[in-house]
């Protein structure tokens, strides 16, 4: 099941999220907006399993990567409010 993966401009290009992803959803692409001259990209969101390891690995105060689980997935995982 694919999940929505959003990359925000708080990305510092550290590659932590890319290394944390067990399904290789993320990759780094050239970007001049940060010191590292690269930013995370999510070209293979269909492979995202929703583990949120990328979110946990992100060192920025405001997460650069967010995985959005659909309502049905959230309920089935017992995460619904």
From Swiss-Prot:
Keywords, comma-separated and alphabetical: 4Fe-4S, Chloroplast, Electron transport, Iron, Iron-sulfur, Membrane, Metal-binding, Oxidoreductase, Photosynthesis, Photosystem I, Plastid, Repeat, Thylakoid, Transport
Record-listed E.C. numbers: 1.97.1.12
Amino acids binding [4Fe-4S] cluster 2: 21, 48, 51, 54
Catalytic activity: reduced [plastocyanin] + hnu + oxidized [2Fe-2S]-[ferredoxin] = oxidized [plastocyanin] + reduced [2Fe-2S]-[ferredoxin]
Molecular function (Gene Ontology), one example: 4 iron, 4 sulfur cluster binding
Residue ranges annotated for the 4Fe-4S ferredoxin-type domain, each copy included: 2-31, 39-68
Matches recorded under PROSITE patterns: 4FE4S_FER_1, 4FE4S_FER_2
Residues that bind [4Fe-4S] cluster 1: 11, 14, 17, 58
A Pfam family this chain is assigned to: Fer4_21
Top-level division of the source organism's lineage: Eukaryota
This protein's record includes keyword Metal-binding: yes
Assembly and oligomerization: The eukaryotic PSI reaction center is composed of at least 11 subunits.
PANTHER family with a match to the protein in the record: PHOTOSYSTEM I IRON-SULFUR CENTER, PHOTOSYSTEM I IRON-SULFUR CENTER-RELATED
UniProt-recorded name of the protein: Photosystem I iron-sulfur center
Organism field: Angiopteris evecta
Encoding gene (name): psaC
